[in-house]
C-alpha cells in the first residue's frame, strides 16, 4: 500500500466493478469453450464454482478437448493455480482479515482481485477492492 490520501470508497468500487465486469465476460467464453470441449452443463458449472482461476479452467478444458489424459489435464490446471497461493501470502498480510473469514476469501485470490487490491492506498480501500472484485467475478 502506498502512503497518501485515502481513495474514496466509490472510486474503489468503480474500479473493482470495471475489472470484474470486463474479466467476467471471459466466463461466457469459458462456457462456450467448455461446451465445445464436450463437458456438460453441470460439469461446466461445477468447474466454475470450484476452480475459480480462469487460466486453470481453460487449460483443463483445452487439454480434455484435445483428447488429453484427464489426470494430466487436472495436474496442469492445478499447477497453473498454484501461483495464487503466492498472491495469498501477500494479500493475507495486506487485508488482515479475521481468521474465520480467510478460508472463504482464499477462493477469491486470483490475478484480478490481487491487482485491484494492491492498487489501493489504504487497508480499507484494499478490502473494498478485493471484496467487490471477488463478488463481481464469482
PLM segments and residue spans:
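Helix-loop-helix junctions within the multi-pass membrane cores of secondary transporters/permeases
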Residues: 3-4, 74-138
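Selected transmembrane alpha-helices and immediately adjacent juxtamembrane segments
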Residues: 17, 32, 36, 135-138
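Transmembrane alpha-helix boundary and packing residues in multipass membrane permease domains
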Residues: 31-32, 61, 89
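Short, Lys/Arg-rich, polar N-terminal cytosolic tail immediately upstream
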Residues: 1-11
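The first (N-terminal) embedded transmembrane alpha-helix
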Residues: 18-30, 51-53
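Membrane-interfacial helix-loop connectors
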Residues: 35-37, 42-83, 95
Amino acid at each position: 500500500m502506498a502512503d497518501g490520501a485515502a481513495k474514496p470508497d466509490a472510486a474503489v468500487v468503480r474500479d473493482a466493478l470495471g475489472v470484474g465486469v470486463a474479466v467476467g465476460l471471459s466466463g461466457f467464453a469459458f462456457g462456450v469453450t467448455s461446451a465445445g470441449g464436450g463437458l456438460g452443463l453441470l460439469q461446466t458449472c461445477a468447474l466454475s464454482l470450484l476452480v475459480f482461476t480462469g487460466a486453470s479452467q481453460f487449460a483443463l478444458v483445452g487439454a480434455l478437448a484435445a483428447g488429453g489424459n484427464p489426470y494430466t489435464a487436472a495436474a496442469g490446471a492445478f499447477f497453473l493455480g498454484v501461483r495464487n497461493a503466492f498472491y495469498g501470502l501477500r494479500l493475507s498480510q495486506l487485508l488482515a482479515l479475521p481468521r474465520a473469514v480467510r478460508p472463504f476469501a482464499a477462493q477469491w485470490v486470483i490475478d484480478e482481485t490481487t491487482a485491484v487490491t494492491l492498487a489501493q492506498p489504504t487497508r480499507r480501500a484494499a478490502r473494498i477492492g478485493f471484496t467487490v472484485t471477488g463478488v463481481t467475478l464469482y
